[in-house]
Design a protein with these regions (language model features):
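Long compositionally biased, domain-poor regions of proteins
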Residues: 1-2
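Extended polysaccharide-engagement surfaces of secreted carbohydrate-active enzymes
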Residues: 216, 229-235, 239, 259-385
Length: 385
């Protein structure tokens, strides 16, 4: 790995994803002793090295995570979400002390979410992705501990972060009540500011970035999945805010950049490895939770490409020469795992994928994304932007 057992993203995220994937395979595929031991040891390390638990320091002598506005770490909620999934998959095998430590970790991360401001901004550095992963940890805590005294506050904060993930200027005047079963809060009352341009595009890393344009769908979908999966037969918490504006972003931007093989065009380039197909879980979210036949088509296309690419590596790695080493392996495994779970929990039933020629015909006209100075067109012979 880049920084095995370290306290930064390269160390913590990689370990958390490894733990989650190992535990997932034990629960849904085969319970092999070595795999179960890996799931348990990596979970223990992730939990014990968190700032709220402190039973063991990372190899650099530090602890990871967020506990308050005064002591927080960028992106720690994303890693904590993977820890929560790992804990859920092996919950029956955890002793009471480990369960308590998992609670302390998630409560600390959520304490930070309750204290902090909800950021917004769309020029160069959208906060859409970051707010999306804050939704994830709040949903995970609600799912695992639905009767906690803080659960109503976690729920409200989760909804606010969800509305302000793909937040659009039109939300300021959106008086829809998303959860009338719970209260009369409107979209406009939870809106803090725009993370999208008026044409539904966004910028991250200082340019129009297709990877970040789609990843919020995946994050919000994983939050909805955690709520449904973790709560089991007793669904106390649910919210229509969790896929807020995902349809509009898909229809106004992403569909116009989606290629027949499931890849998405990147008019301004990409600063990660090319041909990752890591938008696969965004497709799964739209197919399984929104009944989107186009998304089902491109999810299947992307999965075929992912499988073919894996066959080119001698050891079964997801891709050759990954940009961020073992961390990329964890992220890619994370995506494929979530895609499987989406279909397991939200099956598409008899829905058939759209026909690719029909999709191309519906998206054949030239399209302008004015806020990014992008023009695209597609014919049966070429795609250009």
């Amino acid at each position: 790995g880049e920084n095995t057992m370290g306290s930064n993203e390269a160390g913590v995220r990689t370990n958390a994803d490894l733990s989650m994937l190992s535990a997932f395979l034990c629960r849904y595929d085969r319970h092999e002793p070595r795999l179960a031991l890996m799931a348990e040891k990596t979970l223990r390390y992730a939990v014990h090295t968190h700032k709220a638990v402190r039973r063991k320091a990372c190899k650099d002598g530090r602890y990871w995570g967020s506990t308050s506005v005064a002591d927080h770490q960028w992106e720690s909620s994303l890693w904590a979400m993977s820890v929560a999934y790992s804990a859920f998959f092996q919950w029956e095998r955890l002793d009471s002390l480990m369960r308590d430590d998992v609670y302390r970790l998630l409560k600390a991360e959520c304490d930070y979410e309750l204290e902090r401001d909800i950021p917004t901004g769309y020029i160069g550095d959208t906060k859409a992705e970051e707010n999306g992963w804050e939704v994830d940890v709040l949903a995970a805590a609600l799912g695992l501990f639905p009767d906690d005294a803080l659960a109503p506050r976690w729920f409200q904060r989760m909804r606010e972060f969800a509305v302000n993930s793909y937040s659009h200027p039109s939300d300021a005047d959106n008086h829809t009540i998303p959860d009338p079963w719970y209260d009369n809060s409107t979209i406009s009352s939870m809106y803090r500011g725009a993370n999208l341009y008026p044409d539904w595009t966004l910028q991250n890393h200082d340019f129009f970035h297709t990877s970040y344009q789609n990843v919020v769908i995946q994050e919000l979908g994983e939050a909805a999945l955690a709520l449904r999966l973790f709560q089991g037969d007793r669904q106390k918490w649910k919210s229509e805010t969790l896929l807020h504006n995902c349809d509009s972003v898909t229809q106004n931007v992403l569909n116009w950049l989606t290629l027949p093989d499931g890849e998405q065009a990147m008019p301004n380039g990409n600063d990660w490895s090319l041909f990752l197909y890591d938008q696969v879980t965004s497709y799964s979210t739209m197919a399984c939770m929104r009944g989107d036949a186009d998304a089902l088509l491109f999810e299947q296309q992307a999965l075929r490409k992912i499988a073919r690419r894996q066959q080119t590596t001698p050891d079964g790695a997801w891709l050759l020469r990954p940009d961020v080493g073992a961390r990329r392996m964890g992220v890619q495994g994370h995506r494929v795992m979530m895609t499987w779970l989406m279909h397991h929990i939200f099956p598409v039933g008899g829905m058939q994928p759209a026909d690719v020629k029909d999709f191309m015909l519906r998206h054949a006209e030239a399209r302008i994304l004015p806020c990014q100075n992008i023009v695209r067109t597609m014919t049966g012979d070429y795609f250009a932007c």
